[in-house]
């Protein structure tokens, strides 16, 4: 008798995606982050649903409804902090997932890579709108500053900003629509994840060597399900420690003050996962230039496949490219640090140098180094 998982219309899809899927035999723990991101998304949707049951999207009561969740709702505090810190874990896994794709040359799977970039933008939009919802000082001023950037668009900028606000400033209408979008976007993300997986399973996964895997594949279950479970345990352990011991470690103290349009916080800054892009935005004195640089800091990922000049797919046997990759990583850490610092000397100059280095590495230095390596290998 044929196994039901191979004949049932629904289970057949699950089986070919997660059980009998032929996977390369040598993929390392760096390939765990896809499943970890799926786990993060599930955690965010579940905790978010419970938070939405008690939250009110109204400027008069939003802040106190979040306080009510933490103080009066059974286990409300843990749900709230799981959601807030879950977002940080989500972005940590996202950055590592993208970094792995760059290091091992997974961007050559162009459809999967491009859907991944769309996913990154969507997750960033969702996180930004979620940060506005508690209606604290940083929520309000973050929303004001970031939405105001759209006014740099010629001709339609001002109208566009007022259209997003639903008035002449960030107010009740803005909060209501941000809550609506924040609720619906995770489900759109889930649909995009399925498309991402669909394209991935069309071509098959890359591996650390960057070589074709057709000759040596193993079933996904039990080998990689066990491996993914180990990664999931580490993720949950880290998240639990963060939530139970220092839930406010990654937050901003200013967000514990109710939003006040008449008082500007001394340093307006977003959550840590946006700081690198915020530093790039701030390092350009021109408003429109800054906005374009901000968008390009993420969109530049889309042209990485075009800039690939190396004859080898993976960086594993290309030491010069590895050095450039780790310089890029260090540069992103520098930008993240600068994004959280006040706008004064020497931080402005460091931010400008780091921003120039970021774009130079991806657009010029790394492709040139790859060409040099080709010459050295006589390819």
UniProtKB/Swiss-Prot annotation:
Described purpose of this protein according to its UniProt entry: Component of the ubiquinol-cytochrome c reductase complex (complex III or cytochrome b-c1 complex) that is part of the mitochondrial respiratory chain. The b-c1 complex mediates electron transfer from ubiquinol to cytochrome c. Contributes to the generation of a proton gradient across the mitochondrial membrane that is then used for ATP synthesis.
Membrane topology type: Multi-pass membrane protein
Name of the protein in question: Cytochrome b
Family per similarity comment: Belongs to the cytochrome b family.
Main localization, broad class: mitochondrion
Subunit structure, interactors included: The cytochrome bc1 complex contains 11 subunits: 3 respiratory subunits (MT-CYB, CYC1 and UQCRFS1), 2 core proteins (UQCRC1 and UQCRC2) and 6 low-molecular weight proteins (UQCRH/QCR6, UQCRB/QCR7, UQCRQ/QCR8, UQCR10/QCR9, UQCR11/QCR10 and a cleavage product of UQCRFS1). This cytochrome bc1 complex then forms a dimer.
Residues reported to bind a ubiquinone: 201
InterPro entries (alphabetical): Cyt_b/b6_C (IPR005798), Cyt_b/b6_C_sf (IPR036150), Cyt_b/b6_N (IPR005797), Cytb/b6-like_sf (IPR027387), Cytochrome_b (IPR030689), Cytochrome_b_C_euk/bac (IPR048260), Cytochrome_b_N_euk/bac (IPR048259), Di-haem_cyt_TM (IPR016174)
Keyword field: Electron transport, Heme, Iron, Membrane, Metal-binding, Mitochondrion, Mitochondrion inner membrane, Respiratory chain, Transmembrane, Transmembrane helix, Transport, Ubiquinone
Subcellular location: Mitochondrion inner membrane
CDD domains in UniProt: cytochrome_b_C, Cytochrome_b_N
Binding positions for heme b b566 per the UniProt entry: 97, 196
Superkingdom as given in the UniProt entry: Eukaryota
Gene name, Swiss-Prot/TrEMBL: MT-CYB
Listed cofactors: heme b
Cofactor note: Binds 2 heme b groups non-covalently.
Further remarks about this protein from its record: Heme 1 (or BL or b562) is low-potential and absorbs at about 562 nm, and heme 2 (or BH or b566) is high-potential and absorbs at about 566 nm.
Gene3D superfamilies (UniProt xref): Cytochrome Bc1 Complex, Chain C
Any one Pfam family match given in the protein's UniProt record, by short name: Cytochrome_B
Residues noted as binding heme b b562 in the record, renumbered to the chain: 83, 182
A Gene Ontology cellular-component term: mitochondrial inner membrane
Listed GO biological process terms: mitochondrial electron transport, ubiquinol to cytochrome c
Claim: Ribosomal protein is one of the keywords in the record: no
GO MF assignments: metal ion binding; ubiquinol-cytochrome-c reductase activity
TM helices/strands, residue ranges: 33-53, 77-98, 113-133, 178-198, 226-246, 288-308, 320-340, 347-367
UniProt xrefs under PANTHER family: CYTOCHROME B
């Amino acid at each position: 008798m044929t196994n039901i998982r191979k004949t049932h219309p629904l289970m057949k899809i699950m089986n070919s995606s997660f059980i009998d899927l032929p996977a390369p035999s040598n993929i390392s723990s760096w390939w765990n982050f896809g499943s970890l991101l799926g786990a993060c998304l599930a955690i965010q949707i579940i905790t978010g649903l419970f938070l939405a049951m008690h939250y009110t999207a109204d400027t008069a009561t939003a802040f106190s409804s979040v306080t009510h969740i933490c103080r009066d709702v059974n286990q409300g505090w843990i749900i709230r902090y799981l959601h807030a810190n879950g977002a940080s874990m989500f972005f940590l896994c996202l950055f590592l997932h993208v970094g792995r794709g760059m290091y091992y040359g997974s961007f050559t799977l162009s459809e999967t890579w491009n859907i991944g970039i769309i996913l990154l933008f969507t997750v960033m939009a969702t996180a930004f709108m979620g940060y506005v919802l508690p209606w604290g000082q940083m929520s309000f001023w973050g929303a004001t500053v970031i939405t105001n950037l759209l006014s740099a668009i010629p001709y339609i900028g001002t109208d566009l900003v007022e259209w997003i606000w639903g008035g002449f400033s960030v107010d009740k209408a803005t909060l209501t629509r941000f809550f609506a979008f924040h609720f619906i976007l995770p489900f759109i993300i889930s649909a995009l994840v399925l498309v991402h997986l669909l394209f991935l399973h069309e071509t098959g996964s890359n591996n650390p060597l960057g070589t074709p895997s057709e000759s040596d594949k193993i079933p996904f279950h039990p080998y990689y399900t066990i491996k993914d479970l180990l990664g999931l345990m580490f993720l949950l352990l880290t998240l639990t420690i963060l939530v139970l011991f220092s839930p406010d470690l990654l937050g901003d103290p200013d967000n514990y003050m109710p939003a006040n349009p008449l008082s500007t916080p001394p340093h307006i800054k977003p959550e840590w996962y946006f700081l690198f892009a915020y530093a790039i935005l701030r390092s350009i004195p021109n408003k429109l230039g800054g906005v374009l640089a901000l968008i390009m800091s993420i969109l530049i990922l889309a042209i990485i496949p075009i800039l690939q000049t190396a004859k080898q797919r993976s960086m594993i046997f290309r030491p010069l490219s590895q050095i450039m990759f780790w310089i890029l990583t260090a540069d992103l850490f520098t930008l993240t640090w600068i994004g959280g610092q006040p706008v004064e000397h020497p931080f402005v100059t460091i931010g400008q140098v780091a921003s120039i280095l970021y774009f130079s590495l991806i657009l010029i230095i790394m492709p040139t180094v790859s060409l040099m390596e080709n010459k050295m290998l006589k390819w």
